Amino acid sequence: MILVTGGTGLLGSHLLLELVREHNEVVAVKRPSSDLEAVRHIFSYYTGEVEELFRLIDWVDIDLMNYAEVERAMIDIDQVYHCAGLVSFQPRDARRMTEFNVQSAENLVNACLETGVDRLLHVSSTSTIGRAPEGVPANESMIWARSKTSTSYSESKFKSEMEVWRGIEEGLKAVIVNPAVILGPGFWDRGSSSFFRLVARGMKYGAPGVTGYVGVQDVVGAMTRLMDSDISGERFILSASDQSVTEIMEMVAETMGNPRKMKAVTPRILRNLIRLDAIRSVFTGRRTLAPELARSAFSQTHYSSEKISKAIGFEFTPIGEVIRQVAVHYLADHSD
């Protein structure tokens, strides 16, 4: 039996679909307030048997911060996919995010060890990969260290990884994946999926910052293949290609039938937008442009996926094809 955390998110919902399609017994962790209709909608992109497959999932309400609840959920579980995690670049969320990301990982690792779970797959992020020398793509051997440009999110994910490495030292069979920015259909109002909404609404600005991108189905494919292997005590970068924000936005615009060159946002423009956003937040109570996130708009990081390719012969879908597939679903969802 397989337990999945974070099953109501972009990655988790795609993973659940793959697992039930392969006739696995699946337990999915959720909060009482979780929106399961969003998961059903993800399923509908790929199958006409939404309800039949959805009924195969045993949904359970569990507080991942409560160790006793987590341990009880592990009874009869063979494999655990830990996809849950908070993502925020707002300073006000840093403490809560770090507490949840680290404590949930600690509780899951301890419960896996206590109940004898066979394998754990932990979803981390490329943000925990250390900085590479100029001109060299970052790889799994490069260790994260706090710096002026690091974010609270990257620190929380690094500390979460440390819990998994601690579990491995104590005898747990576990593997870690470090996906780049994940592109996939659904959840159009948040995360990387909002690229499509922004372009559809006429966004004209891009940014020179470069990072890795990967399709959600590739991430799921790599995860399940790693879980089915004997590999343990390793982490793997999952990145199809490195692109600038401008390049991604222009690919999205072209695929959605409205090709255009994006104007380059400058540091001065961005600083002014951040100041305006700070003033606006006095009235709204929420900042949209966090300084941490804004800094990444001009940073350039390249990643190597050579390790996963050599380990299991994994091949990534070209990011242009991923964008084309996602755009089809965006346009279908907004055809009215």
Q: What residues fall within each predicted segment?
A:
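N-terminal Rossmann/SDR dinucleotide-binding element
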Residues: 1-79
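Active-site Tyr-X1-5-Lys
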Residues: 149-175
